[in-house]
């Protein structure tokens, strides 16, 4: 009786060991990250999602910055005046806001136009927009620090945008290296040339430079967000476009 029980336990233990061995072989046989196209595609989708979420956050910060400029005692009088002049089609203000320094990039205005641009060129256009803001964001923060009464809420957001803009640039470069499609980095980007206005002794000129920067920053951060969604949609052959999170609304 005892011998039979011992044998039964022995065989049960053998079966358990064999089961564990087979399970372990199944685990180690799973492809490592990047070894299969399916896993690689998942990782690329995650990179796109991270970049899009970050671009949305930057765009929200740009909107908040403009809202504070329009409502804070430091700048509201000047900003409201410029807004009223724009609504009255004042030539100086309208021309100013229609000449953001990234205008030479000739960004697509419709989805149809965007589809005519190759994926590598589209990627470089997004990178150029981000690089074009390095210098103006730095000077915007520097000059605001020197202006009496400049609220911390604006300074903090401009600094946050500057830092996150660099992070987003790095993340998009990682996507570019994975996407490839003949991608060759083009480090040419539009130069910002209005530092003199931002440093002007004339208060109106100085505040209009800030007004224009805050407006163009909002426009370009919004573009980057929507362009990344468009890029993701095209990279995954369009099936992502039906997702409400990735709806495209090009400016």
Curated annotation (Swiss-Prot):
Where is this gene product found? Secreted
Q: Which residues carry attached sugars according to the database record?
A: 2, 73
- Tissue specificity of this protein: Expression restricted to placenta. Abundantly expressed in trophoblast cells of the junctional zone and trophoblasts migrating into the mesometrial decidua.
UniProt entry keywords in alphabetical sequence: Disulfide bond, Glycoprotein, Hormone, Secreted, Signal
The record lists its disulfide bonds as 100-216, 233-241
Q: Name one GO cellular component term.
A: extracellular region
- In terms of one coarse class, where is the protein primarily found? secreted
Is Ribonucleoprotein found in the keyword set? no
Q: Which CDD domains match?
A: prolactin_like
Q: Does the keyword Glycoprotein apply?
A: yes
Name one molecular function that GO assigns to this entry.
hormone activity
Which InterPro entries does the entry mention? 4_helix_cytokine-like_core, Somatotropin/Prolactin, Somatotropin_CS
Cleavable signal peptide: 1-29
* Family recorded in the similarity comment: Belongs to the somatotropin/prolactin family.
Question: This protein is called what?
Answer: Prolactin-7B1
Q: Which organism is it from?
A: Mus musculus
- Gene that specifies this protein: Prl7b1
